């Protein structure tokens, strides 16, 4: 028993930093862990049900191609933010069920994993574990985890990037046999788990770190080869998600503007609350909270830069990130020069994690050198700190923050500044490194208290106890399935409110999410379909009191036959007015036999060629086989009026079977497995070579 207790104590001491990070996570996200709270808004919206649908209707290696339940039907490959390819989602969906409570618990786990990754990364840049712990603690309170808690991709990107940067550190990537496969897997998950804008900023951040690492590395060739393998193999694996979209870019807009930037109105959130009535815009797109420690150390950092040029690198990265986060002519220039940066819709949230990482390392490197500064330098730093306080007071009053908010902010900053002074005094008086680490640990504890209090005052964006938020009308897990396949034909689609619609109404109606669970067929939904030509062309129609194409899509499964595609809207009108008498082509008869989620079966008899128009959404994923007397021919669908699915049918007596198949499915999986093999085989070869050389 005594040995067991001793072993437990030794383990606790050995991993005390990780235990502290776990404790912080449990305290902050205790209501996630209890299952009584989740992030609000989008977390329970499209992102929740898209991930539910991915594993309800398919699996990782056999993903669904088509979701018929919302927006008149949508292809899976178009939903770049669905999160189904994120492996932790697979684990939860398969073993725990993808309920809101479990999704929130997963998010808490991921944030813990991200902070542990940053701890490992910090140890490369600072001299001892306590400083690394300080970095990990600050990263645990990354604004991405709180202001953007509803956005799965933003959080997951911020979780994974520290791990990838950690794997890229020269000593680890060269000396650890598992570094390449682990790095490939992490980059693959970064590709599939991040929003596109976050992914691009993460790749640029990795590139910047690569040049930093290789500058100080003697074994540059060995290092560069290993990094190249990680990113090449990870990219090949990630194309399982992106290849169909990349080869269908013609369906998407090419010029994307930055619709969420860092401006004066939200710049105040670097220290003030981001959930406040005096601010404008989406509260989840505001926060750049830096924490009190960095702000108090700014004056000292100015002097430390003269002695530690490494800080200049981080300062440069801060300014680069800021440029990408704001809207300016310089930003537009960078977006026009740097490939793929122009796809960023939300510059502030896309580049904020890079900005935050830089801020943390400036903080750590400054703190590490703080005891080397002269007394005069520290006095000057305190005078500059007073100027910073005046600047913060001016911002608070000009933006109409309450007196209590301004007063509390000053108390936090002054208390932090006093703790820094006490640490400096301790570093002079205490010669024992262990004793000084205890003082630093107390500074860390004070910062933890301030961070927790700050985010508890800003819970609107990251904690809601209305787990189902009235979106479903009942709890997520109690909604019964109504539709069971196969059907003879598709039932009418459900439009919850009559047109006309304003843009926000047809783009952001959460209520349609329940149809993913019931299996019914919703007309609209809160999903990112606005960029696809087929869906974008419906927007003007939804803004009318009545439109033939919308009405046609709403009806139960229906076929119009025609000889050409002239006056299609008139034909649709006649079809709907004349009691669905729509097969007007003589000697052409169509009968539906079966309707399934991703397939349809018809019997077709015709003495002439004709066009078959379905009241279904067009997507290039849909193709068909026409079989007559065991001889089959494949045909592809094509769009009419940009949105409707049409087929050119030759004369004959056929069994017509249409099926949704994701484009380039064989090619993307072939590339995925080649990337996996590249990662594993290169690991074996390079480690054998390294062993021989050593």
For each of these PLM feature ranges, what is it?
Residues 21, 112-124, 129-215, 226-246, ...:
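Membrane-embedded helix bundles of polyisoprenyl
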Residues 26-35, 58, 87, 92, ...:
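Membrane-interface helix-loop junctions at the exits of transmembrane helices
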Residues 405-410, 447-609, 613-620, 626-632:
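Extracytoplasmic
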Residues 159, 172-175, 180-185, 198, ...:
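Contiguous transmembrane helix-bundle modules in multi-pass membrane proteins
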Residues 4, 8-78, 458-466, 471-512:
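Hydrophobic alpha-helical membrane-insertion signals
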Residues 79-87, 263-304, 310-311, 345-363, ...:
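Alpha-helical transmembrane segments at the extracellular/periplasmic loop-to-helix junctions
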């Amino acid at each position: 028993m005594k040995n067991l207790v001793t072993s437990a104590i030794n383990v606790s001491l050995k991993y005390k930093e990780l235990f502290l990070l776990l404790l912080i996570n449990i305290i902050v996200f205790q209501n996630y862990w209890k299952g009584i709270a989740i992030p609000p808004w989008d977390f329970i919206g499209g992102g929740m049900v898209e991930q539910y649908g991915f594993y309800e209707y398919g699996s990782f290696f056999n993903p669904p191609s088509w979701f018929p339940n919302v927006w008149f039907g949508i292809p899976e490959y178009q939903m770049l933010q669905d999160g189904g390819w994120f492996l932790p989602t697979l684990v939860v969906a398969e073993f725990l069920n993808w309920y809101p409570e479990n999704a929130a618990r997963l998010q808490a786990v991921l944030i813990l994993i991200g902070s542990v990754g940053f701890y490992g990364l910090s140890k490369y840049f600072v001299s001892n574990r306590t400083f690394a712990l300080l970095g990990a603690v600050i990263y645990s309170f990354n604004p991405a985890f709180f202001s953007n808690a509803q956005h799965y991709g933003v959080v997951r990107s911020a979780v994974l990037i520290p791990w990838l940067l950690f794997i890229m550190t020269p000593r680890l990537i060269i000396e650890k046999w598992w570094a390449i496969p682990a790095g490939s897997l992490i980059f693959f998950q970064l590709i599939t788990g991040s929003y596109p804008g976050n992914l691009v900023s993460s790749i640029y951040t990795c590139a910047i770190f690569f040049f930093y690492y290789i500058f100080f590395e003697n074994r540059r060739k060995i290092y560069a080869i290993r990094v190249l393998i990680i990113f090449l193999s990870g990219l090949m694996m990630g194309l399982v998600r992106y290849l169909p979209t990349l080869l269908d870019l013609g369906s998407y807009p090419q010029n994307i503007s930055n619709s969420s930037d860092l401006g004066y109105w939200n710049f105040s959130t670097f220290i003030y609350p981001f959930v406040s009535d005096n601010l404008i815009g989406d509260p989840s797109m505001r926060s750049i909270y830096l924490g009190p420690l960095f702000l108090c150390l700014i004056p000292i950092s100015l002097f430390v830069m003269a002695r530690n040029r490494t800080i200049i690198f981080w300062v440069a990265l801060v300014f680069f990130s800021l440029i990408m986060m704001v809207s300016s002519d310089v930003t537009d220039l960078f977006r026009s020069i740097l490939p793929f940066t122009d796809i960023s819709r939300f510059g502030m949230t896309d580049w904020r994690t890079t900005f935050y990482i830089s801020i943390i390392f400036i903080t750590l490197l400054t703190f590490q050198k703080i005891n080397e500064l002269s007394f005069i330098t520290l006095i000057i730093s305190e005078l500059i700190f007073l100027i910073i306080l005046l600047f913060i007071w001016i911002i608070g009053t000009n933006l109409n923050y309450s007196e209590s908010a301004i007063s509390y902010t000053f108390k936090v900053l002054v208390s932090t500044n006093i703790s820094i002074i006490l640490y400096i005094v301790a570093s002079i008086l205490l010669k024992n490194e262990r004793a000084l680490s205890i003082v630093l640990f107390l500074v860390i504890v004070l910062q933890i208290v301030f961070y927790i209090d700050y985010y508890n005052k800003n819970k609107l964006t990251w904690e809601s106890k209305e787990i189902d938020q009235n979106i479903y009308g009942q709890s997520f897990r109690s909604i019964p399935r109504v539709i069971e396949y196969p059907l003879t034909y598709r039932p009418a689609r459900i439009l919850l409110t009559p047109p006309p619609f304003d843009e926000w109404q047809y783009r952001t109606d959460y209520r349609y999410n329940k149809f993913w669970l019931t299996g019914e067929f919703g007309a609209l939904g809160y999903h990112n379909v606005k960029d696809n030509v087929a869906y974008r062309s419906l927007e003007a129609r939804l803004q009318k009191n009545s439109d033939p194409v919308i009405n046609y899509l709403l009806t139960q499964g229906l076929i119009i036959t025609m000889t050409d595609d002239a006056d299609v809207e008139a034909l649709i009108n006649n079809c709907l007015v004349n009691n669905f008498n729509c097969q007007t082509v003589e000697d052409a008869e169509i009968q539906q036999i079966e309707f399934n989620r991703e397939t349809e079966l018809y019997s077709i008899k015709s003495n002439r060629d004709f066009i078959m128009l379905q009241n279904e959404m067009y997507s290039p994923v849909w193709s068909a086989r026409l079989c007559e007397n065991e001889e089959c021919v494949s045909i592809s669908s094509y769009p009419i009026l940009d949105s409707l699915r049409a087929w050119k049918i030759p004369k004959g007596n056929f069994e017509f079977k249409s099926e949704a198949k994701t484009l380039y499915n064989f090619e993307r999986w072939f590339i995925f497995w080649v990337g996996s093999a590249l990662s594993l085989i290169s690991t074996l070869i390079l480690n054998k070579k390294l062993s021989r050389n050593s």
